[in-house]
């Protein structure tokens, strides 16, 4: 992985000088530059779940309202509050970009969606975030946010929306998605009784790794998207949308993509990015990897074999009155 701290401190969107000298590192996934003791404040929107541009732009307004409001809330630590009050940093993110570019969209979007069209929507969307954040900051009597947009990896949240994670292309249309579930979770019995394939987590005690199946729809898998195109897409999004960073992993074929070619990519794109990592499609050696390709036949077979029944699963666990009784409150 690579972090270009100079770019993170010097630029908002690439090419727009907007100083952020307090930033000294990023969060673990690399999408948000942070000062010492500063916190992340993220929200997320899904263009392929919107019925056209107007709904997309409205979703941007709501996400900006949410994050800008959260930026007003104090934490339990004075040093953190001080840097939050100074920067008011937020990160409105987008997921499902691969599906968006593939035309896998609801009615209201252009049938001929492409990167050029997306760049226009990103640029217009960014201006809405900036305008809304400035208005909200003025109404609250605080400085506008030093940074407002990002692309987070969204490996988990994207599953809830049924979209591809962040800027990433899927490993294949049909795939296994491995998810870690604690053995004390309310859903563990339903999963075990439904014969969802699972094994003990190799890295965490009292945790199971379950294999769920996904159909990403008619979108290109990362094996069909060259690393050059992936780098170019990251650069485009860093230029037109993200004034924080873009959290992205560029996938490549380690057999056909030689070290000299990878070096050329890094030499060309590192000066124009804030963060990026690279990983081979397969043979990477990571146990219990989040994604694994499936054939359509394997996918259909698992659909027939697995029927999960959550009807007896409770989402709440009663714990009594642990907060306030009369004039006395429990601090938790």
Identify what each model region corresponds to.
Residues 1-5, 13-54, 60-76, 86, ...:
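Catalytic alpha/beta core of large soluble enzyme barrels
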Residues 38, 93-96:
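Catalytic-loop motifs flanking and including active-site residues across diverse enzymes
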Residues 71-78, 96, 101-153:
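Internal maturation/activation junctions in enzymes
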Residues 329:
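Short linear clamp-binding motif
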Residues 20, 33, 54-55, 80-89, ...:
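Alpha-helix capping and helix-loop boundary segments enriched in small/acidic/polar residues
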């Amino acid at each position: 992985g690579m972090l270009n701290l100079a770019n993170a401190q010097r630029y908002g969107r690439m090419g727009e000088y907007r100083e952020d000298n307090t930033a000294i590192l990023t969060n673990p996934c690399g999408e948000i530059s942070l000062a010492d003791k500063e916190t992340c404040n993220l929200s997320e929107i899904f263009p392929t779940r919107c019925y056209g541009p107007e709904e997309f732009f409205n979703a941007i307004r709501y996400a900006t309202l949410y994050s800008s409001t959260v930026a007003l809330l104090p934490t339990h630590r004075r040093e953190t509050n001080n840097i939050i009050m100074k920067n008011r940093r937020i990160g409105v993110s987008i997921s499902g970009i691969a599906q968006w570019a593939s035309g896998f969209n609801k009615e209201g979007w252009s049938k001929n969606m492409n990167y050029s069209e997306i760049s226009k929507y990103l640029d217009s969307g960014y201006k809405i975030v900036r305008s809304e954040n400035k208005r909200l900051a003025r109404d609250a009597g605080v400085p506008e946010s030093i940074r407002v947009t990002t692309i987070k990896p969204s490996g988990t949240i994207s599953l809830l929306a049924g979209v591809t994670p962040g800027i990433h292309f899927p490993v294949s249309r049909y795939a296994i998605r491995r998810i870690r579930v604690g053995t004390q979770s309310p859903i563990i019995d339903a999963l075990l009784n439904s014969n969802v394939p699972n094994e003990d987590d190799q890295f965490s005690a009292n945790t199971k790794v379950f294999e769920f199946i996904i159909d990403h729809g008619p979108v290109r898998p990362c094996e069909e998207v060259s690393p050059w195109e992936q780098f170019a897409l990251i650069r485009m999004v860093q230029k037109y949308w993200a004034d924080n960073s873009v959290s992205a992993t560029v996938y490549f074929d380690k057999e056909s993509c030689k070290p000299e070619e990878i070096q050329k990519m890094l030499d060309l794109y590192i000066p124009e990015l804030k963060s990026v990592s690279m990983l081979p499609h397969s043979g990477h050696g990571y146990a219990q990897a989040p994604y694994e390709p499936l054939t359509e036949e394997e996918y259909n077979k698992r659909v027939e074999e697995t029927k999960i029944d959550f009807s007896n699963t409770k989402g709440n666990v009663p714990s009594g009155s642990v907060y306030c009784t009369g004039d006395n409150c429990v601090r938790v």
